[in-house]
Regions:
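Bacterial N-terminal signal peptides
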Residues: 3-16
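Flexible, solvent-exposed loop/hinge segments and secondary-structure transition points
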Residues: 20-163
Length: 163
């Protein structure tokens, strides 16, 4: 009887631990943070003389913010979104994806709303991606990526101290 009781006690106390993994917590980017990242990228590119589009997506690739400078055309917005989606797919910058997976870049670029070109960066908190930013419109993907980085830099302290 004692063995049965001991076994039941172990089972009962082990159940909450097993159930604890049924629910997870995730960090999500606020609209305010996404707006500040996008505005930072726009401001950075304007300072350098470029008219760009910026798209900020959440960790699942859902669009949170779209900003298009006055002379940036609609295709730049599509390209920026597709670059951000490449980041969500790979959990790394779109330039790193292009370099690291050169063997399948052509196939990846056939996917709808995904483009493996420089200009997309992850937004991370404590090593976890909470979103991505894509930029298009500067004269070169490296410059798009630099503007995206400056957008993230604008909020980096907030990211560093996020709970």
């Amino acid at each position: 009887m004692r063995r049965i009781l001991a076994g039941l006690l172990v089972f009962v106390f082990a159940m909450p631990a097993a159930r604890a993994t049924d629910v997870i917590s995730v960090k999500l980017m606020t609209l305010e943070l996404a707006v500040d990242i996008a505005q930072g990228a726009i401001d950075a590119c304007r300072k350098d003389g470029y008219q760009i589009s910026v798209v900020v997506v959440d960790r699942s690739g859902r669009t949170q913010v779209v900003m298009r400078d006055i002379f940036a055309n609609q295709y730049m917005t599509q390209l920026a979104r597709a670059k951000a989606n490449a980041v969500v797919l790979s959990n790394t910058s779109s330039s790193a994806l292009r370099k690291n997976r050169a063997d399948i870049v052509n196939e990846l670029n056939l996917l709808d709303d995904l483009l493996v070109m420089d200009g997309g960066l992850p937004v991370t908190v404590a090593g976890s991606m909470i979103g991505a930013v894509g930029v298009s419109g500067a004269p070169g993907g490296d410059l798009d990526e630099a503007c995206a980085q400056r957008g993230i830099d604008r909020v980096q302290e907030r990211l560093d101290f996020a709970e």
